[in-house]
Design a protein with these regions (language model features):
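Short, charged beta-turn/beta-strand-edge "cap" motif at the junction between a beta-strand
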Residues: 20, 79-81, 167-169
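Protease-domain processing segments flanking chymotrypsin-fold serine proteases, especially trypsin-like
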Residues: 1-69, 73-74, 90, 95, ...
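Conserved active-site neighborhood of the chymotrypsin/trypsin-like protease fold
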Residues: 73-77, 125-150
Length: 313
């Protein structure tokens, strides 16, 4: 008489059939794989900017965002107009080409969006927002947070930083399929010289204290529509810090009209008030190798064996 498997036997066997646990690697925020970064508005290499997020409304990319921990992303207030319904937003993480989602990319709803109270319209102060993901993510090489600067992290004028996004390559154009993430190196410009450029036809101050500019006097290279809310990251001691949030500009890549960003360092207290356990400066994290940020689970062979055992009961 042959032996029979009971449900209790199967339950006892399953833990033995688990995939080897992925215990993760201890690392820090603001780290990306070694990639060649090309100056001048080019396709970003895979894995170059793992904190880049696509904010989508009704399945259409509208803004960028930056992953800052397992649950929160940083973006621009104008990406969340008052009439918009939160349930129609999705955050896409770990993706380089929006038209062809890569294995390991995530598409998550938002559970909360919070714009700063100072924001009153295009070009105003306070164009910064926080959005909470529908569930926490597990960090993988494709999905990692940028570092938030602390009070001691400063980036002087002339610092070469990078802006990334899926925005228009030129004003009025759409990024063609497969909608590959774009990257551009830009030098920082202090608010006062930048304001002087923008005030040539106006006596009113345009660049406020919570803003920073980045770009080139000759134009031709800049962030544009669709890049809004995305990260301006600068490197310090080998780590990438989110220094700015793409906010506004006059046209796209026009001479003497650099891009204008909200300076993240001006809103550290606000971020700390609304993001539980927000951490600034260098933060240690654990990165897992599993795609999609999922926890370790049964190996495929284990699932097949369990199904076979159930059939012969």
């Amino acid at each position: 008489m042959g032996a029979h498997c009971t449900p209790i036997t199967i339950l006892l066997l399953l833990p033995m059939l688990q995939a080897a646990p992925d215990r993760g690697i201890q690392t820090a925020c603001g780290q990306a794989g070694p990639q060649d970064r090309i100056v001048g508005g080019q396709d970003a290499p895979l894995g170059a900017w793992p904190w880049q997020v696509s904010l989508q409304y009704e399945n259409r990319h509208i803004c960028g965002a930056t992953l800052i921990n397992t649950e929160w992303v940083l973006s621009a207030a104008h990406c969340f107009p008052k009439h918009a319904e939160l349930s129609r937003y999705r955050a896409v993480l770990g993706s380089r080409q929006l038209s062809v989602p890569e294995p390991g990319s995530l598409r998550l709803p938002l559970s909360r969006a919070l714009g700063h109270a100072l924001y009153s319209g295009e070009g105003s102060s306070g164009d910064i927002a926080l959005a909470r993901l529908g569930r926490p993510v597990t960090f993988t090489p494709q999905v990692l947070p940028a570092c938030l600067p602390d009070a001691g992290v400063h980036f002087p004028a002339g610092t070469l930083c990078w802006v990334t996004g899926w925005g228009s390559p030129r004003e009025g154009d759409l990024l063609p399929a497969p909608m590959t993430l774009q990257q551009l190196q830009v030098p920082l410009i202090d608010p006062l010289p930048c304001d002087a450029l923008y005030r040539r036809r106006s006596s009113m101050r345009e660049i406020q204290d919570d803003m920073v500019c980045a770009g080139y006097a000759e134009g031709q290279r800049d962030a544009c529509q669709g890049d809004s809310g995305g990260p301006l990251v600068c490197q310090k001691a080998g780590l990438w810090f989110v220094a700015g949030v793409v906010s506004w500009g006059e046209g796209c890549a026009l001479p003497n009209r650099p891009g204008v960003y909200i300076r993240v360092g001006a809103y550290l207290d606000w971020i700390g008030q609304h993001v539980p356990n927000a951490t600034f400066g260098v933060v240690n994290i654990t990165t897992y190798s599993l795609p999609g940020g999922g926890p370790p689970g049964p190996a495929p062979t284990a699932l097949l064996l369990a199904a076979w055992l159930l059939r012969i009961l």
